[in-house]
């Protein structure tokens, strides 16, 4: 199956999908990490988030990979299966050895959101391990395509599903 690139950056241009079944693969959508949505710092409930001992969880997106292929004989549906690489660190305020990390993948055309999947990735921390590298997915997204509109017309916007306070803190940290 065709693979697309795994790259760490704020914007991840897709090099394209490889060939499959002797045919040229259809162009894949471009995955994009939004800088303000690629980091998650979750604090103990009820804390103001000013002290390191209040940190429950830290997440950082590190990579995206996947594949795309036409799913029907008409060639008007493109299946894109996406995996997201994430580093997750357990903070001193996490009361258990596991956590659910909220993520999303949105299909956009320009600035218009056409589809969005929100899901949780369950993360277990082995005994005496504070940081784990995990992969979410594959998450399937089906996109309509035509001879005039390929998968390259779309973007896959990928990020943590943040609360308004978490998003504001990320934007402040980034100077936005």
Which stretches of residues belong to each language-model region?
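Bacterial N-terminal signal peptides that target proteins for export
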Residues: 1-5
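Bacterial signal peptide processing site
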Residues: 18-22
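N-terminal intrinsically disordered, cationic/polar leader segments
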Residues: 23-24, 63
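Post-signal peptide N-terminal segment of mature Sec-exported envelope proteins
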Residues: 24-48
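Low-complexity, acidic Ser/Thr/Pro/Gly-rich terminal tails and inter-domain linkers that flank the onset
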Residues: 50-75
């Amino acid at each position: 199956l065709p693979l697309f690139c795994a790259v760490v950056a704020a914007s991840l241009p897709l090099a394209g999908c490889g060939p499959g079944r002797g045919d040229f693969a259809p162009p894949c959508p471009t995955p994009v990490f939004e800088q303000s949505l690629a980091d998650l710092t979750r604090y103990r409930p009820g804390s103001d988030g000013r002290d390191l001992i209040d940190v429950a969880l830290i997440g950082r997106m590190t990579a995206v990979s996947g594949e795309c292929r036409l799913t029907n004989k008409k060639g008007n549906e493109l299946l894109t299966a996406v995996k997201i690489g994430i580093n997750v660190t357990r903070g001193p305020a996490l009361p258990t050895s596991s956590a659910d990390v909220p993520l999303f993948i949105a299909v956009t055309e320009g600035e218009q959101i056409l589809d969005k999947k929100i899901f949780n990735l369950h993360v277990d921390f082995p005994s005496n391990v504070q940081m784990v590298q995990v992969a979410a997915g594959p998450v399937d997204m089906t996109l309509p395509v035509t001879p005039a509109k390929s998968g390259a017309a779309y973007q896959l916007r990928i990020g943590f599903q943040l609360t308004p306070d978490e998003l504001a803190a990320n934007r402040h940290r980034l100077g936005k």
